Amino acid sequence: MDSKVFDVTIIGAGPTGLFTAFYGGMREASVKIIESLPHIGGQLTALYPEKYIYDIAGFPKVHAQELIDRLEEQAKFFDPEIVLGQAIDKVERLEDETIRLTSNTGEVHLTKTIIITAGNGAFQPRRLNIGNSEAFEGKNLHYYVRDMNQYKGKRVVLLGGGDSAVDWALMLEKIAAKVTLVHRRDQFRAHEHSVNQLKESSVEILTPYAPINVEASDKIEKIQLQEVKGEKIIDVEVDDIICNYGFISSLGPIKDWGLEIEKNSIVVNSKMETNIPGVYAAGDVCTYDGKVKLIATGFGEGPTAINNAKNYIDPKARIQPKHSTAMF
């Protein structure tokens, strides 16, 4: 057991968690970060490290991994303790109001407050279940792009109609021999600007079609598509398939902490407080009236949680802090 009692323990080391840790240091709080994955960065690192992000203030565009690297550098300015590969299974409040966290490895952590920044929680991709497609996962059937260079000069088919599918189609167009995007509807759910770029690109768009089978030997060689509400069937030769049907997420053990949950999100108020005293949430994991799920939103919610956690620990502490320009 780590006998040190931290002021703030942050659950989740994605972008919101990392910035929240930095801001905790700004308020001179002792901070520990606990992440269930073996690395920091959350979904950005695990699913699309090479993908560009366009809606971060001050960055016209930035690679997901670069953003995480910069956030890590910023967070480490105040030397938070970072624990990887642990999920918190149990939360208990002791007689002195200290909170005891027990992880899935049996390790015990002590803290005065908790800020949950677990993003969408644990996640698994929605799989392509046609024919024997599962046999080719990890060969040439993929659910996210870790290294764009593996698709150089390849015939790539993407399945899906959301932001991920459209964004990857546009990015891979530059290096793949051919990119085909298949969607079961005529309308895409992606951002309007991205859809307009798609229509002006060389990406082959097949709508409304749905995959019904694959032909394969060692790898998938063809994917068979059927027109939705029609009888037309076409075969498309492929080198790689990227399925972007989204992810099934779960709060995991967090849902058993006694928190108020609404549609797989933790309910908070304007102070980012949950229904449990001393426990806060920020980023995509939380919800309130008018909530918008963006990384940029989490960057504002994290400091709000820290400032109120600081006041919870010490009621004499200011909720409104000094500006950073006056601190260094």
Swiss-Prot record:
Q: What does the record note about the cofactor?
A: Binds 1 FAD per subunit.
Q: Which amino acid positions bind FAD, per UniProt? A: T16, E35, Q43, Y48, I88, F123, D284, T325
Q: What is its EC number?
A: 1.18.1.2
Gene3D superfamilies, alphabetized: FAD/NAD(P)-binding domain
What GO annotations for molecular function exist for this entry? ferredoxin-NADP+ reductase activity; flavin adenine dinucleotide binding; NADP binding
| Uppermost EC category | oxidoreductase
Q: Does the keyword GTP-binding apply?
A: no
Q: Which cofactor does it need?
A: FAD
Q: Which UniProt keywords apply?
A: FAD, Flavoprotein, NADP, Oxidoreductase
Q: What does it catalyze?
A: 2 reduced [2Fe-2S]-[ferredoxin] + NADP(+) + H(+) = 2 oxidized [2Fe-2S]-[ferredoxin] + NADPH
Under Pfam families, the record lists: Pyr_redox_2
Q: How does it assemble?
A: Homodimer.
Q: Which family does it belong to?
A: Belongs to the ferredoxin--NADP reductase type 2 family.
The protein in question is named Ferredoxin--NADP reductase 2
Which organism is the protein's source?
Oceanobacillus iheyensis (strain DSM 14371 / CIP 107618 / JCM 11309 / KCTC 3954 / HTE831)
